[in-house]
Amino acid sequence: MTDEIFHKGIGSVAERNFRPHVNCVRPTPDNKYLCAVDNGIDQVKIYRVNKQTNKLELVDILRCPRESGPRIIRFSDDGKYAYILFELSNEIKTYRYDGSGKTPEFELIQTIETSPKRDIHDTHNAASGLSLANDGKHLFCTTAGEDTVSMFERDEETGLLTRKFTLPISGEYPKDLVIFPDDRHLAVVNHVSGTINVFTVDYEKNIIVMHGKPLKISEPNSIHIWPVPEE
């Protein structure tokens, strides 16, 4: 460990998030900056890594709407677009990213709801998981409470998203999801029901079909697929 940063401040939702709570930290695709998504104070803080001192330097802050609860950030493989999932407002915001200048630039170009329901601010719902398919053409998210998974088609030129479906996941309170390397299957971890559900994705019919029985696991929160190196 060469450096550590403590976020300070007071959030806007006293019942849930009233103090700094970093939920996701991810480098920009060009490895110039580190994005710290703070769910508690509705901010994404952007740090530069000083390679001479091995210290983090705050260079910018994405100040998100109050009571939106940013949770996860993902970047497209081409490094041009960033997608931020908002837990409390149940939205995905698309940003155009440019790291070529002295400071990073994030331009908001789209906001889309994680659920087609009208009341996106339903306090019983919480956007929870976000994953980009390996082909770069599809993005998936889960919404806990209503317990659904949504698939969006992604325009590779503009970065914009178009909803293709929102379907139930046959589990209670999904916390995360992951796309398999073949892009044909996805797994959802359900915290309350204590299961991992695997689905086959049919991109032509815009549906998912459960693949086998749910796997039992105690209160799962996250999931990741990591390749095993060949001997």
Language-model features: where?
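Beta-propeller fold detector
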Residues: 1-9, 57-62, 104-114, 161-168, ...
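Asp-box/WD-like beta-propeller blade repeats and closely related beta-sheet repeat scaffolds
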Residues: 1-24
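Short loop/turn segments immediately following beta-strands, especially the blade-tip
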Residues: 48-55, 95-106, 152-159, 200-207
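Short coil/turn segments that connect the beta-strands within blades of beta-propeller domains
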Residues: 30-32, 78-80, 135-137, 182-184
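Conserved beta-strand positions in repeat-built beta-propeller and related beta-rich domains
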Residues: 28, 36-39, 76, 84-87, ...
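Beta-rich catalytic cores
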Residues: 21, 69, 126, 173, ...
